[in-house]
Amino acid sequence: ITKEYVLVDGTEMEVDYPVEGRFQYTRYAGTGGLAVGRRMGVRRLAFASRLKEPWRVAYSRALRPDTRVMLHRNVLERARRLAPFLKFDPDPFLVVGEDSGKLWWIIDLYTTTDHYPYSAPLVPRDADGARIRDLGGPNHDEPDLRRLNYIRNSAVAVVDAYNGDVRFYSTDEDDPLLAAYRSHFPELFSPIETMPDELRSHLRYPDYMLWAQASVYATYHVQDPVIFITGGDAWKLPRELFHSDELQPMMPYYTVMDMPGEGGPEFVSVIPFAPPATTKRLTAWL
């Protein structure tokens, strides 16, 4: 339903939730949306044309001049329209503010290029040595990482789930690409230190970023130059059956694990490495 627009604060109350066979009603109390204007006014007619709903919008008596229309309600689409030069993690996650009790969407953002000097392109391979053509087929919606030779998780976006307000925070002040974007849009990004603590405590290591790093580390973990050149100790990324009958590249996943030498259980992102098909030895987890 987030692909559709909604009209709020009209003459009719909005259905909230049922209680004992009866509906509770409410009225939107947020600040999101754009006022539609008076009936048959230029502003109202413009919205009716834009939404392709002439009768519902232009002539409806259920709308008031201060009734608002909320557009671009999908959080990824909403944030991407403000910063189309960044790559967006396809898995935004919803958190509850510990102090405010409000709901927020957090999206990890990446700066990428395929023109970084002296950096090899990312060409991941699976356990059989074949190049991975996608990042998971229909069950993953990740942007194409292939051939990129630079990626950093340099920013995050926070979207107010009620009002739709979007805020961008820079998490890597040393990233040259983000520095270039900030020079052109100086008011778009805020320092990560200004993010409220109730949101900052929910930040996690992106599994999309770990997947890219694991793809590179599978080759470059080798320290012996001879073995590195021959590729005899190269690790591979495994495949798995996930929501289909076809093998797909395995993505990192989050779990709670008690790591050796640590003080207790931790929330971590992990991905296994598989040996080449010609060997039978266990490799490693990252």
What do these predicted ranges mean?
Residues 1-286:
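Soluble extracytoplasmic regions of secretory-pathway and membrane proteins
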